[in-house]
Amino acid sequence: MKSHIAIICIIMLSFFSMHEYRCVGSTIGRSSKIYIPLCFHNNCIHPFKDDCWCCLAAGTKKDWCWLEKDFPDAKELCMKTCTRKI
């Protein structure tokens, strides 16, 4: 008799946890949009130092990068010229 009560309690607890998971899971699904920035800091000359800003937008050239040594405002320049083409 005690084992039957224990099994019933375990089943009821698992139903409660499944219900809670379903409620939490629906809110997580809506907020899981990943933001990918247009420009990223990359290493162009020195392998261990990020020294340029490169464009990651769709439809652009692969080598569209600005060296910080040549362009002091490389980040701003990348953000202005690099646009998403959807």
Curated annotation (Swiss-Prot):
Belongs to the MEG family. It comes from the Eukaryota. InterPro entries: ESF1_brassicaceae. Coiled coil: none annotated. One of its GO terms (biological process) is suspensor development. The gene is ESFL2. It comes from Arabidopsis thaliana. Residues 1-21 form the signal peptide. It holds the Pfam family ESF1. This is EMBRYO SURROUNDING FACTOR 1-like protein 2. Disulfide bonds join C39-C54, C44-C82, C52-C78, C55-C65. Keywords: Disulfide bond, Signal.
